């Protein structure tokens, strides 16, 4: 009985994050109008309340790998809503503000959206996936009327 309990204690943490919520490897590719989306932020927001989202960033080819508790550990297992955001560089500050470096850093406005803003929020993107145990590959082909 002691051996069985010891085995259970050793196996239980496998595939779980530091909070005990299981995570699974997640990667994929994001394109917009058929072109790779580089430098986009990717978030998987779990439907399960109290579960932290998984985050990632796309490379030059639009590929991403998600992190929840550690590097490339994946996303929480279960249904997740997806948000993808990408903006251009922030607009220049007016000269009178740019002189004060501290003010310039704290007052930077976000840049122009480079993909449709509906994808910026997990509530409005309409992208939803089920993360399952093991490895998961989710590609997203985004559509819209913004020119790439």
Regions picked out by a protein language model, each given a short descriptive name:
Residues 1-14:
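Sec-dependent bacterial lipoprotein signal peptides
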Residues 16-148:
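Beta-strand-dominated extracellular/periplasmic modules and repeats
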């Amino acid at each position: 009985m002691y051996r069985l309990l010891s085995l259970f204690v050793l196996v239980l943490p496998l595939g779980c994050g530091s909070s005990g919520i299981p995570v699974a490897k997640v990667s994929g590719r994001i394109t917009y109008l058929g072109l790779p989306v580089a430098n986009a932020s990717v978030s998987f927001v779990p439907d399960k309340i109290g579960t932290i989202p998984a985050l990632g960033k796309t490379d030059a080819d639009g590929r991403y790998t998600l992190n929840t508790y550690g590097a490339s550990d994946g996303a929480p297992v279960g249904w997740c809503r997806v948000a993808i955001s990408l903006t251009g560089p922030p607009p220049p500050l007016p000269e009178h503000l740019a002189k004060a470096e501290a003010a310039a850093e704290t007052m930077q406005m976000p840049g122009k959206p480079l993909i449709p803003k509906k994808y910026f929020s997990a509530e409005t993107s309409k992208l939803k996936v089920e993360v399952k145990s093991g490895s998961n590959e989710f590609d997203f082909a985004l559509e819209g009327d913004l020119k790439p």
